[in-house]
Regions:
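Transmembrane alpha-helices and adjacent helix-loop boundaries
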Residues: 1-311
């Protein structure tokens, strides 16, 4: 039971990392990215291949996965950044699905649908399953704490205020002299790096990854996390991720509680419950449990905000 609870906690931490990354892309910059699972997969596969095939240290693999996800994020952003709304969502979703199909069919990259197994974890053999899980939980929690403070500082920085200005009215931000394209690309790069970090940490914990793990449904879970916690709020992103993982795991026990419900029907009921939860959140908590709170820019000695920080 303890092993199961620790695994859930690690999963919640990974979801929190993804939610924090998406909070920058979607919550702050207003970019609708439905391909977040693609960047998650880039980080997982890059770190897994580098450590498993090349024998590189795990820290090097995680760093490489994070960096590569950021680079891919920049490339995708440069192609899609001038698109808006539904068009951006469709293109990013297409990127993630194309990546998943390629990884499924090209056996020479990562064994296709069989996936990568035996991905090393830090001191897994020396510590044994119990201590390894506790160690890894500490690593994931540390990563969440560091990323949380980075994103939280970003939210209240001049850069964060420009992103919110772009989200609220892109034309006004452009009229104020801000290079909208550059800011969008930077937001995409930062968020993609966080998604890649989450993917790398996930792969080294489970020691196995396959294309089926990176289905679009994962994107929905992270979106649900942000909507639950509150878009644009770092605390809300973490809270939403924890609540969504708790909800997903608790609904696994539906089958024994409902007489005559088969495993297949229980899985369908689980997805239905998730959909109902999303509708209820949108109905009663449109801005999330912890709505975005924008701090005013710092004042100068004259009592006015610096010109560069008014956006």
């Amino acid at each position: 039971m303890e092993h199961y609870l620790v695994a859930i906690a690690v999963t919640a931490g990974v979801y929190a990392l993804m939610a924090l990354g998406m909070n920058v892309i979607w919550g702050m910059a207003g970019l609708i990215n439905l391909g977040l699972v693609g960047f998650f997969a880039v980080g997982a596969y890059a770190s897994g291949l580098i450590t498993l095939k090349l024998g590189a240290p795990i820290a090097v693999g995680v760093a490489a996965g994070t960096l590569l996800a950021a680079v891919v994020g920049v490339l995708v952003a440069l192609i899609t950044v001038r698109l808006r709304g539904d068009y951006l969502a469709i293109v990013t979703l297409g990127f993630a699905e194309s990546l998943r199909i390629v990884m499924s069919n090209e056996l020479w990259i990562a064994n296709g649908t069989d996936g990568l197994s035996g991905i090393p974890g830090p001191f897994r053999a020396q510590l044994g399953p119990h201590l390894f899980n506790l160690l890894y939980l500490g690593i994931v929690v540390a990563a969440v704490v560091v990323l949380f403070f980075l994103v939280d500082r970003l939210v209240n920085s001049p850069f964060g205020r420009v992103l919110r200005a772009i989200r609220d009215d892109e034309e006004i931000a452009r009229f104020a002299g801000k290079n909208v394209v550059v800011f969008k690309v930077k937001a995409f790069a930062f968020g993609s790096a966080a998604l890649g970090l989450a993917g790398a940490l996930y792969g080294h914990f489970t020691s196995y990854i396959a294309p089926d793990l990176f289905a679009p449904l994962l994107t929905l879970y992270i979106k649900l996390s942000l909507l639950t916690g509150g878009l644009g709020n770092s605390k809300g992103a973490v809270l939403g991720a924890v609540l969504v993982v708790f909800f997903l795991e608790s609904t696994r026990f539906l089958a024994p509680l409902i007489p005559g419900l088969s495993a297949v029907q229980a899985a369908a009921a689980r997805e239905l419950a998730i959909s109902v939860a999303l509708l209820l959140i949108l109905r009663f908590y449109a801005k999330g449990l912890l709505p975005e709170r924008i701090e005013p820019p710092p004042l100068t000695a004259s009592g006015a905000a610096p010109a560069a920080s008014r956006i």
